């Protein structure tokens, strides 16, 4: 949008400009006299003067009669600014636009397809590249990306790491960003220069600038991943014999950028233009340097930033092609409805892991139906189940340690994966994968008519003979040919003895026990408790119908309480988690005379088991990355965010046909449900 168009929107109203960088200086030189500018706003400074205008706090804007705020920043930064001051603007009836005329108070509707996204296709990129003699690539968010929501999240993660070492720099992340922005007004700084400014403004020398810079570099380097489809394009251009240049705005040295490129196998490029080495950015004269180096050659630049990569390269006579960053795709889909739940760095890391996985490929919108999709069960585990299962595992571990339990039983088969995650925490709590099932516990726990009546109160979808066989392990052709209750109680005595043999082999200590079950009323725990002399407390993901067990004297604490079912989305989607949390062997039905588990006949195919394994590997990969990236002190539970991630399994297109053939099994009740019906 040209200024005159923006001026038509503003009219003669008083305005404030947000931003005090060099682009603001340029804007004021060209347009300052044409507009009624009251002052400048900034995220760090709220007083002083610059470019002949006062810097004022946003709280004073309404009293000064300002009706418009114009944000002068890159599109990606505009969004962050709008989030920061949007509510203030709405509450004070102040319009908020960027310098390109975009209304920053407009809310993008949530979508699960790319129909409203217009972008160049891979085919168009290849055509443009064929006509170019030199091809320049941006680096960050184009060839590589970070496993965080924004590069500034690196500062918050580093702050957590420093605090865990006893190094506290108040407002560290704010100082770090301000130093970078302030120094960049003159020319792109090196990371060491940024930290010299940080230490100066923070008023201390906890580390040297070099040490802090090295720690940030190592952290950032560990957060990077390659955008595989863009690398494929890069490699194809190298194979075509094109001259390739990497043109990047960065505070890292040329040697460090080379390390990044080497890590991900980027070879065959001819030159590397690093802004802080040349003392000029892409928004300044870096593209002039590129043009001069290849004078007379037709150059194509490929990057993600609308302003720095596309507009600025074009202003230097360079052709440009935009590659969508993961953040841009996320924004274009209205943040998929999850963005409102973000409140801390833990949430931002979760979002970052999600974006890095689902939007790694910038050409997603080229698919025929343009729906957001996932290709494999491992993605389902990682993207949709990983956040919820991670928060639950951390909650359970914290609860067990805080309450003084030093041993925990992970009941089969739900506990198969959870125990693996528990091991990754390297906790001192002794843990045992405990072979059991609702059926096995019931068979070993039958001691009275009341027990039989309790089990019979739970409806079974089958004949009386089938009920007796499936639930109690007694096989007869005619239920009337035996004394049913006596047979059940006798079976219970024998199974109790067999189970004690199994327990003795485990070598469980004499202290109180924590017991894991995933989604349950408490039946399994109730009957297992009879096999142990010590107290047992259940730690469940979700307890169903707790009022049904109120008179059973059970000690149970649940991650999700039943009373919250009306306000929580988990009750619509936990079946998906329950299906994936299984083991690679059938349900156990009882113990043999030597205390070894006996299993029912496997009903799942090898293909089904491979699907479960892939989904569980995805969850484990997510958990491992989350633990690696975020210090323990910064990990925060957020069920609402987790629920929204999980609910997305109903919104995206699942391309793994093997996953879609799975069935949700419940042998105890004689029920089988297609997974397609569960995920709607």
Per-range role (PLM):
Residues 47-49, 245-247, 251-298:
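Substrate-recognition "cap/lid" segment bordering the active-site pocket of phosphatases
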Residues 1-107, 492-495:
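Hydrophobic, well-ordered beta-alpha structural blocks that scaffold small-molecule cofactor pockets
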Residues 92, 105-106, 297-303, 311, ...:
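Long, low-complexity, Lys/Arg-enriched
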Residues 41-47, 305-307, 543-545:
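Short, polar loop motifs at secondary-structure junctions
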Residues 188-189, 193-246:
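Short, acidic loop-to-helix structural element flanking the phosphoryl-transfer center
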Residues 7-8, 56-65, 120-128, 287-292, ...:
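Short amphipathic alpha-helix with an adjacent loop that forms part of the alpha/beta core around
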Residues 126-174:
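Active-site neighborhood of HAD-like aspartate-dependent phosphohydrolases
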Residues 15-17, 68-70, 136, 245, ...:
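Short glycine-rich phosphate-binding loop at a beta-alpha junction
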